[in-house]
Amino acid sequence: MKPRVYSNLKKLWEKHGAHDFGRISQIFFGFCLIERQFQIKIFQLTGRPDIVAVRNNKKFAFEVKTQSGSDVAIKNEDLLGVKGYTEQAIIAVLSYPDLDCMWVLAKANDIRAGKWPIAFLKQHSISSLEDELNESFQKIIEKYFTTAYLGTTSLYDVFEEVCKLEKNK
């Protein structure tokens, strides 16, 4: 990732704290899915799964996580929220505060609850989809950073509008 992406994420973390940073990251992830031609069927900031999306008649369930250190905590509830729900059950983790922050998309059926380093989750990732979404992530942060800086509500309002426009296409 470009240094500017890391810098912008750091600004959002410092301004909003861990809880809202997680929600903002989840909305950014939703924007990435839309840019990659996914149709968002479910998007919720609380509850599980966080996102259900469809592309090419294939359904995906995502639990979106952020981390504040070297490991990410994956709860049993996170896994149960996506497992068995769809064809593709994914734990999506933003690797911030790593300098080369990126999305890691781990197959939920391949892992168990616990604290895991990003390197472990990478071993269970869907790398082709991961590459697609990470390519979009830089653009999404640049496009929506100012709105995200205002807060979760402002960014979510824009996200809802984009979702409505996509449904009407």
Regions found by a protein language model. Name each.
Residues I51, K59, I90, T146, ...:
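N-terminal cationic amphipathic segment used for targeting or macromolecule association
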Residues L33, I51-S68:
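Conserved catalytic cores of phosphodiester-cleaving nucleases, focusing on short active-site segments
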Residues S7-H16, R36, I42, T66-K115:
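Catalytic cores of nucleic-acid endonucleases
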Residues M1, E35, D98, V104-K169:
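Non-catalytic C-terminal interaction segments of nucleic acid-processing enzymes
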Residues M1-F43, G47:
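Acidic-basic catalytic patches of nuclease active cores, encompassing PD-(D/E)XK
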Residues R48-D50, D98:
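Short secondary-structure capping/turn micro-motifs that flank functional sites
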